[in-house]
Amino acid sequence: MGYPGKNHKSYQTPKRPFEKTRIEEETRLVIEYGLRNKREVWKAQSHLRKYRKAARELLALMSSATNQTVFEAKKSELISHMQRAGLLGPDADIDNVLALKVPAQLERRLQTLVYRKGLARSPKQARQLVTHGHIAIGGRRVTVPGYLVTRGEETTISYAGKSPFVDASHAERTRITRPTGAGVN
């Protein structure tokens, strides 16, 4: 089974390492979301793969029609979990889980939400602000750019209390403008 304290790989590498269309798509995502490398894209894919697997198992359980109450309970549990995570809307179904794509997962990252809220000029700067401890969620400093923000936490993203960015007259903060076309809540 292995040593429980040892970290294990949380992603799966592509089966075809030199597929041109996949490489171009991953590169586009890395640039658009300001990711460090393609490994972060692969982690998002693996995360979604787990949700899709659970949805397929639910569909198999539904088709076997053994126990509808168990199916309904597991279905509502999966969908409510994904709604809290912000991956699905309020009127979602299992088909919506199966239709999820990687950008939906990447949009829930703290780094992306900091940029979308207008707290940083670019996704790269958002990543830097997070790793340097200038961003807080609900008053608690978070230094992980890949932190998946839930819907409830989304409104509490702000500059950390001891960060120099709290001051509205900070030189860098005056240069930060809202990104064009960003849906700021």
UniProtKB/Swiss-Prot annotation:
SMART domains: Ribosomal_S4 (SM01390), S4 (SM00363). GO terms for biological process: ribosomal small subunit biogenesis; translation. Keywords: Ribonucleoprotein, Ribosomal protein, RNA-binding, rRNA-binding. Residues 108-170 form the S4 RNA-binding domain. It holds the Pfam family S4. One of its GO terms (molecular function) is rRNA binding. One of its GO terms (cellular component) is small ribosomal subunit. It comes from the Archaea. SUPFAM superfamilies: Alpha-L RNA-binding motif. NCBIfam families: PRK04051.1 (NF003139), uS4_arch (TIGR01018). Part of the 30S ribosomal subunit. Contacts protein S5. The interaction surface between S4 and S5 is involved in control of translational fidelity. One of the primary rRNA binding proteins, it binds directly to 16S rRNA where it nucleates assembly of the body of the 30S subunit. Belongs to the universal ribosomal protein uS4 family. This is Small ribosomal subunit protein uS4.
